[in-house]
Amino acid sequence: MKPMIVAPSILSADFAHLDLEIKAAENGGAEFIHFDVMDGHFVDNISFGLPVLKSIHDIHKLVNDVHLMITDPVKYIPCFAKAGADIITIHYECFASDEEIFKAIDLIHSFKKKAGLAIKPKTPVESIYKFLPSLQIVLVMSVEPGHGAQEFMVDSLPKILALRQQID
């Protein structure tokens, strides 16, 4: 089994001192930095977008892990790929068909980026099994997407276990 990766999110960072916050994560041993991108449509909240990723891309050596919680991720995949994302994770629930998801994953790979697929807490994990061979990351949401500082949903643990068994 691969070692666990901790990817601290900048969602609750002090944006007036974002460079220092990211450096602190880096100095603390983080290898990834997680960007929760929210559009106010797919989820209720709006977070940040391309300017934030572009502005900090050159100040650290961490892997830029971009989680697109947006209604039309395909439209923005090229923009985030060019802005410095190393991993782009899209949501299963944003798409009308499996074919659209496979095309989005291929688009991410066309930019030489790692592709991830996220599922909301109520989405059956079996829904994404067919995509696993094409993915480098799977994100099983253990909170409702769109808000920080929520209580962990214990119901997500059996999904994670089932996913691990499917991958192994």
Roles of regions detected by a PLM:
Residues 1-89, 95-103, 107-110, 114-115, ...:
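Conserved N-terminal beta1-alpha1 strand-loop-helix module at the mouth
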Residues 168:
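Conserved phosphotransfer cores of two-component systems
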Residues 118-122:
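Short gly/ser/thr-rich secondary-structure transition/capping motifs
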Residues 143-145:
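Short glycine-rich anion-binding loops that position phosphate/pyrophosphate groups of nucleotides
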